[in-house]
Amino acid sequence: MPEPSKSAPAPKKGSKKAVTKAQKKDGKKRKRSRKESYSVYVYKVLKQVHPDTGISSKAMGIMNSFVNDIFERIAGEASRLAHYNKRSTITSREIQTAVRLLLPGELAKHAVSEGTKAVTKYTSSK
């Protein structure tokens, strides 16, 4: 049985072929695509609740996934509610109802009160 063929040998030191993939033809480096996340906001909330506590990058990744998941669930439920009521706009009322439907008991009450507080603060600052 023949050996599996290996990829091209690595270029030698000083070789002109050793141009990285991140470089364009004119020598400029390609700009890295920005990865959006909630890490800044998770960190701010953590410092409000536990000022002396840190968070690992793995835990931050988990928190980011959690926030994305909850966002998608609430947005999906709010969209469904708007569709049921033949509305084309998702308002704070749909979001509030979606939160009440998705989150259990006391957690929903706290989320609704915090949301109402945030909306009030936003509208008063305008």
Swiss-Prot record:
SMART domains: H2B (SM00427). It holds the Pfam family Histone. The modification N6,N6,N6-trimethyllysine is found at residue 86. InterPro entries: Histone-fold, Histone_H2A/H2B/H3, Histone_H2B, HISTONE_H2B_site. The modification N6-crotonyllysine is found at residues 6, 12-13, 16-17, 21, 24, 35. The modification N6,N6-dimethyllysine is found at residue 58. PANTHER family: HISTONE H2B. The nucleosome is a histone octamer containing two molecules each of H2A, H2B, H3 and H4 assembled in one H3-H4 heterotetramer and two H2A-H2B heterodimers. The octamer wraps approximately 147 bp of DNA. This is Histone H2B type 1-N. The lineage of its organism: Eukaryota, Metazoa, Chordata, Craniata, Vertebrata.
